[in-house]
């Protein structure tokens, strides 16, 4: 009985111990569009810091991809006390990876774009750019919803990114996760996302889903040309009309 009591006390204390090891950094609410690609493994591996290796999904709509581009339209951002922070449109570039020593699956953010006032961003890798997003939704009398999106990035280094999409909205799938995201510039630094989302996969080469009627991706400049040289393969497009996240960092 005594051992059982001790075990129960340890189990009850474990969430508190986890909380002691991390602290809330921010909460936010965003609308996202996530694109995944297959590019040269050699090129992608060179973007990862020592101790990490490419870990492409082996199942699901993004099966076989090794590059993530996440287009983020912030609706609301709050600090740990609930005070508002400036919402900034962001493009984040990351790689599905794993730690070589432990095999732990993580994501590594190696680049992206954000407004000049926010550089180098939370992962110390974002470049300064002017970003704009235009999104339109039309629902007909039969309930069919068509979404048009245009994302435009004009980077201060001369690079540019334009993504134009048109797709038929499906029924989003609700889900939640707690991924750990590392920085390529400071690989020992990471953030933990605890999020809930509604995700609508509108194109996937792995599953055969395709409700996209228009897709144009143009990428130029020193940071993008290495990845988008014409040989890249678009693996999936996921529309995420609802993404609610709490961000935690290790407690110092």
Summary of predicted features, one role per range:
Residues 6-11:
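Hydrophobic alpha-helical targeting segments used for export or membrane insertion
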Residues 55-60, 92, 117-118, 174-176:
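Short, surface-exposed linear patches
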Residues 13-15:
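N-terminal signal peptide c-region/cleavage motif recognized by signal peptidases
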Residues 74-155:
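Aromatic- and glycine-enriched beta-alpha-beta binding-site module
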Residues 1-4:
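Positively charged n-region of N-terminal signal peptides that target proteins for export
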Residues 42-47, 66-73, 85-86, 122-130, ...:
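Short linear motifs at secondary-structure transitions and domain/linker junctions
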Residues 19-74, 205, 210-223, 227-231, ...:
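N-terminal domain-onset segments
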């Amino acid at each position: 009985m005594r051992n059982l009591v001790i075990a129960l006390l340890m189990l009850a204390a474990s969430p508190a111990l986890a909380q002691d090891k991390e602290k809330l950094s921010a909460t936010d609410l965003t609308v996202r569009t996530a694109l995944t690609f297959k590019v040269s493994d050699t090129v992608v591996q060179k973007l990862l810091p020592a101790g990490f290796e490419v870990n492409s999904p082996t199942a699901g709509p993004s099966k076989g991809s090794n590059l993530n581009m996440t287009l983020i339209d912030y609706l609301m951002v709050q600090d740990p006390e609930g005070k508002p922070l400036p919402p900034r449109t962001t493009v984040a570039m990351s790689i599905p990876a794993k730690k070589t020593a432990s095999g732990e699956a993580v994501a590594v953010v190696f680049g992206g774009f954000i407004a000049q006032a926010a550089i180098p961003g939370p992962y110390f890798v974002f470049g300064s750019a002017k970003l704009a997003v235009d999104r339109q939704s039309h629902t007909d009398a039969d309930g069919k919803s068509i979404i048009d999106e245009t994302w435009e990035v004009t980077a201060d280094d001369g690079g540019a990114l334009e993504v134009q999409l048109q797709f038929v909205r499906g029924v989003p799938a609700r889900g939640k996760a707690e991924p750990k995201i590392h920085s390529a510039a400071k690989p020992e630094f990471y953030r933990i996302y605890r999020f809930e989302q509604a995700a609508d996969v509108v194109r996937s080469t792995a599953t055969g889903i395709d409700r996209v009627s228009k897709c144009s991706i143009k990428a130029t400049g020193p940071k993008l040309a290495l990845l988008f040289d014409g040989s890249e393969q678009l693996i999936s497009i996921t529309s995420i009309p609802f993404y609610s996240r709490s961000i935690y960092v290790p407690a110092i």
